[in-house]
Amino acid sequence: MQIKNMFAKQIDRDIKGVIKVGQGDDANVQQELSEYVVTRELQKHFADFFANYKTGIVGNTDKMGVWISGFFGSGKSHFLKILSYLLDNREVDGKRAIDYFVEDKKITDPYVLADMKLAADTPADVILFNIDSKSEIPVSYTHLTLPTIRL
């Protein structure tokens, strides 16, 4: 047996080294959602995000902002892009973004899943863009990807 045959997915497939906002075609979205790994730390971030997001759905809040910070290469953009798919209720090949989390057991906490499903089922306009490409400020000063979500 060869080592490459021990993996669930082909190891010689195209794997994006850097997640970019502009890669929104169905093939890329499907790969990102199916291969996204939710670590214990990310489980906490998903729980916090969707618990707070639910506050705006079921009630009123003036706390609307979210700050995502971390070192270069730590997965901020990837996390944000996955959040955008969930909030947009993105569908690829008949499968909703939330389904990747449920079926693949990426999130197992039923309360977090309930909050995620509520968010996915609540209509929202999600606009995801890289501020570098929309700004006249030199690239060295801008390293933000901003989603705009309107309920």
What are these regions (language model features)?
Residues G56-K63:
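Phosphate-binding P-loop
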Residues S34-G56:
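N-terminal pre-Walker A segment at the start of P-loop NTPase domains
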Residues S84-A124:
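Flexible phosphate/Mg2+-sensing switch loops adjacent to catalytic phosphate-binding sites
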Residues T142-T148:
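Conserved small/polar residues in nucleotide/adenosyl-binding loops
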Residues K76:
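Conserved lysine of the Walker
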Residues F79:
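Hydrophobic positions on the alpha1 helix immediately C-terminal to the Walker A/P-loop
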Residues I68:
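Hydrophobic anchor at the beta1->P-loop junction of P-loop NTPases
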Residues Q2-L42:
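Charged, amphipathic alpha-helical linker segments immediately N-terminal to NTP-binding catalytic cores
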